[in-house]
């Protein structure tokens, strides 16, 4: 009976591991996004921005619709991902997780704060 229950638990857990999202390493974030090429960011509430992270450590966001604020700041890599500091703001650090083909989730702890797409 115990073997049977253990088998069910293993079968239930294995598919979850196979679909677990892949966290990007800081170097992968830099090579994928921080090359000066513009890409799209969308917040969970639907506000969209064109984002540009330059190789020199500068970042810019421009809203593409209603809502959101245009801003500039700086970025740097850290041990787990990257950090941004917007003008007049404090540093915030994030991780990036592959979500789908050409889509990535920007995470602040367990919360998705944006979806990036190319």
Question: Where are the regions that the model predicts?
Answer:
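Lipid interaction determinants
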Residues: 16-72, 76-118
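Bacterial N-terminal signal peptides
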Residues: 6-15
